[in-house]
């Protein structure tokens, strides 16, 4: 698999289109950090790490719905393995005029665009959520 984070985002998108309550994905630290931001911003209910027999583990993500419709309307990967996108603090994108969130990987950790602006750090724009 060339893009593990893109794979997780696609699994979330597909599960919500099918109306699933949970979705699982192989565990990694970056995926867990992105899920922490999604949970803090209110886009997912939560997640838990379960151990598998191969030792890698698995993240089971609880998806969130409002009146039967998915809370996440749009989930797009910005920085891809073939084309990384880095931005300074002043250049961080505003998603849907501030209604959405960009998830940024910074030297201070993975955080939302608002947190990165307040911490005055830039970094790699991983994805946008609306």
Swiss-Prot record:
Alphabetized UniProt keyword annotations: Ribonucleoprotein, Ribosomal protein, RNA-binding, rRNA-binding
SUPFAM superfamilies from the UniProt entry: Ribosomal protein S8 (SSF56047)
GO cellular component, one term: ribosome
A GO BP entry: translation
TM segment ranges: none
Gene3D superfamilies xref list: 3.30.1370.30, 3.30.1490.10
One Pfam entry name: Ribosomal_S8
Domain of life: Bacteria
One MF term in the entry's GO annotations: structural constituent of ribosome
Keyword rRNA-binding: yes
Role according to the record: One of the primary rRNA binding proteins, it binds directly to 16S rRNA central domain where it helps coordinate assembly of the platform of the 30S subunit.
Classification via NCBIfam families: PRK00136.1
Record's subunit section: Part of the 30S ribosomal subunit. Contacts proteins S5 and S12.
Family designation: Belongs to the universal ribosomal protein uS8 family.
Protein name: Small ribosomal subunit protein uS8
